[in-house]
Amino acid sequence: MIEGNSGEIILEKNKDTELVPASITKIMTLTLIMEALEEGKIQLTDSVSVSEYAASMGGSQVFLEPNETQTVDTMIKCISIASANDAAVAMAEKIAGSEPNFVKKMNEKAKELGMKHTQFKNCTGLDDDIKSGHFSSAYDVGLMSRELIMKHPGISKYSTVWMDTITHKTKKGESQFGLTNTNKLVRFYDGITGLKTGSTSKAKYCLSATAKRNGLNLIAVVM
């Protein structure tokens, strides 16, 4: 557990153990998206075209189709609320041209933040396996969570939504798709600001939870 304003560690156990992070990987993905927005490289209203590769992602997804377009705003919503792998890859391609190029930026940002026990191989957390070189630690997840929630508090506009819908617009016509937040804390925890859950067969269950009460910002990571 970290205090968000100062970065002080309040409680820790095995904080530097390298583990597979599953979808809390997307905290870094969202951090780079928010940076790109603030730097004016992209706008919330920009269209994002979905590649065949992005549409092919398994795991948690919103079933985007090849050549479908959605706004940056909608893509952030899909990643933050539904942990959508297809939307994450589509945004990685939008910002960096390809997922590998985006992952390079993720690792550069991790180094900048002092994340000494982290290496990313993708922007989703899919197929995370320490043997493949995709890993992080509870403390490192806390560092990137602090970067996202403290420097880009606008993310809570998305991460605190319990349920929402998006509209698919494809050759087949329009259809509604429901989103439900994977972080159940947003339903009942007073002061919750986010942030991200993760779950795979290898990682089991992971959580980075952020909350603010009376000016105190707390970040709790469980892996």
Pin down the residues of each PLM region.
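Active-site-adjacent loops and short helices of periplasmic peptidoglycan-processing enzymes
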Residues: M1-G142, I149-M150
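Penicillin-recognizing serine hydrolase domain
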Residues: S98-M223
